[in-house]
Structures are given as C-alpha cells and as structure tokens.
Design a protein with these regions (language model features):
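Membrane-interface amphipathic segments in extracytoplasmic regions
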Residues: 1-165
Length: 165
C-alpha cells in the first residue's frame, strides 16, 4: 500500500486488501472528546461565524450530519468505531494516564515526554463555561443536539456530558 499519503488520506481511498493490511499492522488509537465540549471549543476558536453560541448551535443543527464540519461532526460517522477494531480509545480528560500507557507500550520513556495535566482550575473553569453556554440553549436545541449526537453518546461513555439524558 505504497500510495502518497497526506494527513487527510482516508481509508476509502484504498482497496480492501490494502485496508486490511494497514489495519492489521498499525496500532489503532482513537482520541475522543465529549461532543458538547467539541462544540464549545469550535465556537471559542472562532470556527463558527455566528455571534452567539445559541445561533452557532442552530447553524450546526441546520447543517445536518452530511454537511457538518469535521470539527463538530459526530465521531461515529468520522471514525467508524463499530467497523474498525481500535486498540485504544483515549478520552479527552484522561490523557495523562492513557498516553502514559501508550508510550510505555511503544517502549518510550513516559516521564520525559508527557507534560503535566494537573491544572484542576482549568477543568473547573471549563466546566463552569460549559454550564453557562448550555444554559443559553433552548430546550428544543438541547433535544436536537442529543439526537444529533445520539450514536456518539451511545458508543462512548460520556457520563458527565450535558447531552446525556
């Protein structure tokens, strides 16, 4: 499978034999993040042109999953976790423990590579910000978002997600 690869190269560009060879020879790691946190991060990074978070969310919902940006598209439609046997699923917020394990498995020195992820003040601030932004949404938008990300919420354990019922 010696084709020119770019960071955007998708498995669909390869034939079945090449796909099986790649999936069998790589350690497959999937990094996941709560869908609502992904929306907030995208909005804060200015990727949405909407003036308010509520109108940004409405733009996302109006775009649907087929026209959705990779920044907020449901993970299940991007990464196919039911079709690809991932070796590791690393959840945002648990990087220190999980990346340490991955580096150890790869035979790399863990302590010298990993930065400290200990700023609980940042986590608290992000939680507060999430609560504020979630409160901007209408009941209808909250229901639509839960439906939009239904398969992500079912496939991954986002137990503290604002979108979980």
């Amino acid at each position: 499978y010696h084709k020119q690869l770019t960071k955007e190269t998708q498995l669909s560009k390869f034939n079945q034999t090449e796909i099986e060879a790649m999936l069998g020879s790589y350690t497959k790691v999937l990094f996941i993040r709560d869908p609502f946190q992904r929306l907030i991060a995208t909005f804060l990074q200015g990727m949405g042109s909407s003036p308010s978070f509520s109108s940004f969310v409405q733009d996302v919902l109006d775009s649907g999953t087929h026209n959705a940006s990779v920044a907020w598209k449901p993970l299940v439609s991007l990464c196919r976790p039911c079709l690809i046997p991932y070796d590791y699923v690393v959840m945002f917020g648990f990087h220190r423990q999980e990346l340490g394990h991955l580096l150890q498995k790869a035979g790399l020195p863990v302590e010298s590579i990993l930065p400290e992820f200990t700023d609980t003040q940042v986590q608290w601030t992000y939680r507060w910000l999430s609560e504020q932004m979630f409160s901007e949404l209408s009941v209808q938008q909250k229901k639509q978002l839960s439906h939009f990300y239904h398969w992500d919420l079912a496939a991954f354990s986002f137990s503290s997600s604002f979108l979980s019922d």
